[in-house]
């Protein structure tokens, strides 16, 4: 092989930087990926939804233990709002829809919302 038809690399590569040896130098390009925005899923207090139903919601849709769910439920009851979890947009949207759907099927006025984290 005389190299006269070779354009820089043994495989005839046409990319990279030639260092004068007749071979291309491999260059590494790092692609920076943007982290997805996160959203807080919040439960809002009302005077009608049973506390036990709120605990059930937290256990079922947010994978909380009975103790964690009870603590969050009491926080919602006392402060008016409580954090269920922080998720990507699609996951948060799904969880809000699941909570609202189950609450409506049980005829409870429970409100669940999502808001973007700063």
Curated annotation (Swiss-Prot):
InterPro entries found in the cross-reference section: ClpS (IPR022935), ClpS_core (IPR003769), Ribosomal_bL12_C/ClpS-like (IPR014719)
Region (Disordered): 1-24
GO biological process: protein catabolic process; proteolysis
Pfam families, A to Z: ClpS
NCBIfam families documented for this protein: PRK00033.1-2 (NF000669), PRK00033.1-5 (NF000672)
Job description of the protein: Involved in the modulation of the specificity of the ClpAP-mediated ATP-dependent protein degradation.
Similarity comment: Belongs to the ClpS family.
Subunit-level organization: Binds to the N-terminal domain of the chaperone ClpA.
Protein name per its UniProtKB record: ATP-dependent Clp protease adapter protein ClpS
Gene from which the chain derives: clpS
């Amino acid at each position: 092989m005389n190299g006269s038809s070779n354009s820089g690399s043994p495989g005839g590569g046409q990319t990279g930087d030639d260092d004068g040896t007749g071979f291309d130098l491999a260059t590494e390009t790092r692609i920076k990926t943007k982290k997805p925005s996160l959203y807080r899923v919040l439960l809002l207090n009302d005077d009608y939804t049973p506390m036990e139903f709120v605990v059930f919601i937290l256990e079922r849709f947010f994978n909380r233990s009975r103790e964690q769910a009870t603590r969050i439920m009491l926080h919602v009851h006392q402060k008016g709002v409580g954090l269920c979890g922080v998720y990507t947009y699609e996951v948060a949207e799904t969880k809000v829809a699941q909570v609202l759907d189950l609450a409506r099927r049980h005829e409870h006025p429970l409100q669940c919302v999502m808001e973007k984290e700063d």
